[in-house]
């Protein structure tokens, strides 16, 4: 199983898997290299730099180096330490560009990013992000949140913006136009759905409120789930 962060070591260079796909096989296919035993023994080394406890926001200098194949080329075996260091530097360069921690950002409009404890005002165009305890004010265009973890929030989704998976206590405030949420897990919530917005699969105790026929409001819950409607009682003012 390929793990974050994967790449391929060649005799003269290292290639780190772009974006969120850490499959060695897919990366080799993109480079038109057959993923065979013979090629693994001559041309390349499948490698990974793996953060402890999957804490991808920590400094890669402390991550574990892993060779993900049984056979390695002779050129690698003559100086494995050299190639490990070259791969570490390549992953560190990728991490510096694509992992953002504890930042306030006006907008992201292209590329792929993993965000930890960040606040972003807008996601635009075809940017794709993964959120962990991060906040996005508004998503527009074809912007995508691959996954939301922890208490991550998205305020508004517009146009054809997409959230792949919501976990934990993650929240989407309002969905408009043709925006979509693929899967909801844990106690994740969608506050309001408008227009032709959609939610694909719902699991656990996730909920979504459908305002498309307002003032008639539908509450979506997972199939087989239980939902209790309780009338809110306002506190009486003190005399």
What are these regions (language model features)?
Residues 1-239:
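Short, glycine-biased loop/turn motifs at secondary-structure junctions and
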């Amino acid at each position: 199983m390929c793990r974050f962060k994967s790449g391929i070591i060649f005799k003269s260079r290292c290639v780190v898997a772009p974006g969120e796909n850490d499959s060695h096989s897919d990366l080799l296919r993109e480079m038109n290299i057959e993923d065979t035993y013979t090629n693994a023994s001559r041309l390349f080394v499948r490698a990974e730099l793996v953060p402890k406890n999957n804490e991808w926001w920590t400094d890669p200098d402390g991550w574990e180096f892993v060779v993900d194949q049984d056979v390695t080329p002779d050129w690698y075996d003559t100086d494995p330490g050299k190639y490990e260091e070259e791969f570490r530097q390549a992953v560190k360069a990728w991490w510096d560009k694509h992992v953002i921690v504890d930042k306030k950002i006006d907008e992201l409009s292209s590329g792929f990013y993993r965000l930890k404890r960040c606040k972003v005002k807008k996601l635009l165009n075809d940017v794709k992000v993964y959120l962990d305890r991060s906040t996005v004010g508004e998503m527009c265009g074809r912007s995508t949140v691959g996954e939301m973890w922890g208490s991550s929030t998205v305020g508004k989704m517009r146009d054809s913006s997409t959230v792949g998976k919501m976990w934990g206590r993650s929240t989407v405030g309002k969905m408009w136009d043709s925006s979509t949420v693929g899967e909801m897990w844990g106690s994740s919530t969608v506050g309001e759905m408008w227009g032709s917005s959609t939610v694909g699969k719902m699991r656990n105790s996730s909920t979504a409120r459908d305002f498309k026929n307002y003032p008639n409001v539908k509450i979506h819950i997972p199939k087989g789930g239980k939902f209790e409607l309780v009338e809110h009682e306002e506190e009486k003012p003190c005399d």
